[in-house]
Regions:
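Short pre-active-site segment immediately N-terminal to redox-active cysteine/selenocysteine motifs
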Residues: 17-19, 23-27, 34, 94
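A short beta-strand-turn-helix
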Residues: 1-19, 42-45, 89
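Non-globular targeting/processing and membrane-anchoring segments
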Residues: 131-137
Length: 137
């Protein structure tokens, strides 16, 4: 898949990192609440082995998504998703749907609908810290 800037993006590129994978759409009210948090998390934790990847499920594609990304100053890669992409994660029935993926590539948490900022941040820190402890001698 390619992002809004034309760069090839694969989830496997972030292997070894804690990844927040967010399925969203420009028309989704709760998604608009979460995206600023994800921008903040990307800024705060990217140097600790954390990454955010957005998957827009907008039917209008880049025509709707690119202006939204510019307006919100989204600082992480976003790709366009579809049914097959959603099925790779067991199906995405409603938006937003967010997965936290650990450094080994396993789904550590799943949130369907709006979850609280502190919920996400606590889980991110837990995954970052547990990975750090596992790496300690």
């Amino acid at each position: 898949m390619t992002d809004a800037n034309g760069f090839r993006v694969k989830l496997s590129d972030d292997r070894g990192k804690v990844v927040l994978l967010n399925f969203w759409a420009t028309w989704c009210g709760p998604c608009k609440i979460e995206i600023p948090w994800f921008i903040e998390f990307e800024n705060t934790y990217k140097n600790r082995g954390f990454a955010v990847l957005g998957v827009s499920m907008d039917d209008d594609g880049w025509r709707a998504v690119k202006p939204f990304l510019r307006e919100k100053a989204v600082n992480y890669p976003v790709v366009l998703g579809d049914g097959p992409v959603a099925r790779m994660y067991g199906g995405v029935e409603s938006l937003p749907t967010t997965f936290l993926i650990d450094r080994e590539g396993r789904i550590a948490a799943e949130h369907v609908g709006l979850a609280g900022k502190s919920t996400y941040e606590g889980q991110i820190l837990g995954l970052l810290n547990s990975a750090k402890q596992a790496d300690a001698p």
